[in-house]
UniProtKB/Swiss-Prot annotation:
Name of the protein in its database record: Enolase
Native source organism of the sequence: Buchnera aphidicola subsp. Schizaphis graminum (strain Sg)
SMART domains assigned: Enolase_C, Enolase_N
Protein purpose: Catalyzes the reversible conversion of 2-phosphoglycerate (2-PG) into phosphoenolpyruvate (PEP). It is essential for the degradation of carbohydrates via glycolysis.
Keywords, alphabetical: Cytoplasm, Glycolysis, Lyase, Magnesium, Metal-binding, Secreted
Length: 434
């Protein structure tokens, strides 16, 4: 009843108005899986290859018709009549068919859409939700947890058209007793921030990930405004709420000058100076998690930063690790960072993603499941976070349905599983001494 009968790829639109792929997998018995894939703005150089048409007369070269054709022909005929429940076989068949290290023949966007749609179809054929099927793929059946959210309330960098250098300013509702409560707290602070910005005569337009995107004189001004917004609620910064930032430092790094250029502030830092700057911020504000605090290729800089800050703060590798198990192993061996950001489309299949999560957890690295700046209504990452008991999730702000769809899915899952079957550990999941 789980044999693949048909695979259909189609070109749809993502949250930035760019084309992306949606895939439908039909199994015998009438079971169907539907999945769509995201796309990043600030991408790591070592991510797998996203196949685009490069036809400048159509979608400014970003069309995915070639990828859709590959799904409907090459991939379909390689997977036809296969057992959808055997996710490893499905993914490995596509990896072998592609034959490259970075999936540049078929495109990781083609492969991932089929991988996720197949998993959803298989879950349907087994009469279970996706998170339960993922737990079984993970060889941890029945083991679930609800993640602590990093809620992005101010967007900067490549995610917004403003002058803020740091790409994401996030809040973590650490006093919450459930994901549902954490989401409510996040929404209340999001609205408090919006009202405060209005009172200051500042813009309340939002960036790619749904956070506010005004101009600020400095990163510290952004942090001060967040601090004020929290104070205007019943919550206490440092007690109920902690902060997290994504520097996306690779986007700030000038390779010619070998400096990190904070253009919005009119200053620049060496590798070590950037670490000292981030240390100063974390001493002044309750920042407990810093993502990509160095350029993706600056392993020495990351090692220094880990030695300086790693005992007290969660240091997250995104562009550094790109959800690649081999790069993560290198980081573990060198003692670089203490957490990893997981993005399905950085590596391109569900099984490879799960394998990377397993390695991270084995070596006590924090795991944060993440969206991309160009998203769809697909909620697979919510199920992935619960089904692998990853502990943390980063899926944007409290606006834009491409972001809130994931939060709403987590609310539904928590309602089904309740706290006994899927505990919410909150702050315990963060690799910091806070």
């Amino acid at each position: 009843m789980s044999k693949i009968l048909k695979i259909i790829g189609r070109e749809i639109i993502d949250s930035r108005g760019n084309p992306t792929i949606e895939c439908e997998v039909l199994l015998e018995g009438g079971f169907v899986g539907l999945a769509s894939v995201p796309s990043g703005a600030s991408t790591g150089s070592f991510e797998t290859w996203e196949l685009r048409d490069q036809d400048k007369n159509r979608f400014m070269g970003k069309g995915v018709q070639k990828a859709v054709e590959i799904i409907n022909n090459k991939i379909f005929y390689s997977l036809k009549n296969k057992n959808a429940i055997d996710q490893f076989d499905i993914d490995q068949t596509m990896i072998n068919l592609d034959g490259t290290e970075n999936k540049s023949n078929l495109g990781s966007n083609s492969i991932l859409s089929v991988s996720l749609a197949t998993a959803k179809a298989a879950a349907s054929s087994k009469g279970m939700p996706l998170y339960q099927h993922i737990a079984e793929i993970n060889n941890t059946p029945g083991v679930f947890s609800m993640p602590l959210p990093m809620i992005n309330i101010i967007n900067g960098g490549k995610h917004a058209n403003n002058n803020i250098d740091i790409q994401e300013f996030m809040i973590q509702p650490i006093s919450a007793k459930s994901i549902t409560e954490a989401i409510r707290i996040g929404a209340e602070i999001f609205h408090s921030l919006g009202n405060l910005l209005k009172d200051k005569g500042m813009s309340t337009t939002v960036g790619d990930e749904g956070g506010y995107a005004p101009n600020f004189k400095s990163n510290e001004e952004a942090l001060n405004v967040i601090q004020d917004a929290v104070h205007k609620t019943k919550y206490k910064l440092g007690k109920d709420i902690t902060l997290a930032i994504d520097c996306a430092a690779s986007e700030l790094y000038n390779k010619t000058r070998k400096k990190y250029q904070f253009i919005g502030e009119g200053t620049e830092f060496s590798s070590q100076e950037l670490t000292h700057y981030l240390k100063k911020l974390s001493n002044k504000y309750p920042i407990i998690s810093i993502e990509d605090g160095q350029d993706e290729s600056d392993w020495e800089g990351f090692l220094y930063q880990t030695k300086e800050l790693g005992n007290s703060l969660q240091l997250v590798g995104d562009d550094l690790f790109v959800t690649n198990k081999n790069i993560l192993k290198k980081g573990i061996k060198k003692g670089v960072a203490n957490a990893i950001l997981i993005k399905l489309n950085q590596i391109g299949t569900l099984t490879e993603t799960i394998e990377t999560i397993k390695i991270a957890k084995k070596f006590n690295y924090g795991v944060i499941i993440s969206h991309r700046s160009g998203e769809t209504e697909d909620t697979s990452i919510a199920d992935l976070s619960v089904g692998t008991a990853s502990g943390q999730i980063k899926t944007g702000s409290m606006s834009r349905s491409d972001r809130t769809s994931k939060y709403n899915q987590l609310i539904r899952i928590e309602e089904i599983l309740n706290k006994k079957r899927a505990p919410f550990y909150g702050l315990k999941e963060v690799k910091s001494s806070f």
